[in-house]
Amino acid sequence: MNVAYAKIEIGLPAPIRVLHASDTHLTHADERDGQRKVELAKNRLACFPEADERLAALGKLSLEMELPIMHTGDLIDFVSLANMEAAKAFADSHDIFMATGNHEFSLYVGEAWEDEDYRNQSLAKIQACYKNDIRMSSRVIRNGDAAINFVALDNGYYYFEPRQLAFLKEQVALGLPIVLMIHTPLYERKLYDDARARSGGCAYLAGVPDELIEDYEPYRYRQQKTDATTAEFLEYVAAEPLIKCILAGHLHVDYDSTFAGRIPQLISGGSAARVVEFY
C-alpha cells in the first residue's frame, strides 16, 4: 500500500495525526452464503485484487505508527458472512473509526434500488462488526491541549437525513474543531468537472445542483438528485467555521478538493493510506 501525507492547518496548539483510508472493498464469500454469492465474490475480486493486501498493510501501518484509522466506507464490497467476519476481526484488533459507505449494505452489487429499506436488511449485522455507530457518531481525539472532534455520517446514498444535520449541530455546539467524515464527497465545481471527465458519465457527488445533473441517465438522476435536507446540510457546512476539514472516499481516486472555497476535502481512492496531520 502506498502512503501519502497531508498537513492541514487548523490552529491547534499541538499536532494531531490520523490515518485516512477508504474503499478497501473486501470480496470474501464461501458456501455459507450460497453459490450466487461465491460467484459474485469471484467476479468482484477481479475489480479489487489487492484488497486483502491493502487492508493488512493499513493495519500494520496503524500499529507501527500508533495512529487511529479513520475509514470513510466500503471496507467490504458486499454483504457476506466471510466479509463480515473479516471486517469484525480487523475492527477488533485495530483502532478504527468508521463512516459507512454504500457497499457495506450491498447484497449483490447493483441488483436492486438502494434506499433505507434496502439498507435496513443488513444494517444490524454490519453494525455489529464495528465499535462505533457507522451511520452517525463522533469521536474526540486529543493531544495535550489540542482536540479535534471527528464526526462520521452516512451519506452513501448521496443524501443526508434531518437527524444527521441535527447531530452535526449538536457536535458544533461542543465548540471543538470538527473533521467531517463521509463516504460520498461534497459537490464543488472543479471536483464535479474532473469527476465527470474521469467517469465519462455522472460525477458521483452529493449535493450537485439540479441543473448539472439534468443530463444524467434516469437511474443516476434519481439516485443523485439533491433533496432539501441535503442542500441545507451543505449550506450549513459551508458556513460553519468550526468545520475544518472533510475526509471522503467513493470516487476510487486520490484527490484534494476544497469545499465552499475554504474547507479542505481529502478524498482517498483506496490504493493508499494518508497520514493526515492537523496542526
Segments predicted by a language model, with ranges:
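His/acidic metal-ligating clusters that form di-metal
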Residues: 57-68, 149, 158-256
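The substrate-binding groove and active-site-proximal loops of carbohydrate-active enzymes
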Residues: 44-48, 73-77, 154-159, 219-224
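Acidic/histidine-rich helix-loop elements
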Residues: 22-53, 107-130, 190, 222
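Residue-level marker for buried hydrophobic side chains located in beta-strands
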Residues: 18-20, 69-71, 98, 180, ...
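Extended active-site neighborhood of metal-dependent phosphoesterases/phosphodiesterases
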Residues: 7-10, 80-179, 203-206, 256-278
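N-terminal active-site segment of His-dependent metallophosphoesterases
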Residues: 1-84
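Short, solvent-exposed beta-strand-terminating loops
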Residues: 13-36, 105-106, 181-205
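Active-site glycine-centered loops adjacent to acidic/histidine catalytic or metal-binding residues
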Residues: 23, 73-74, 101-102, 183, ...
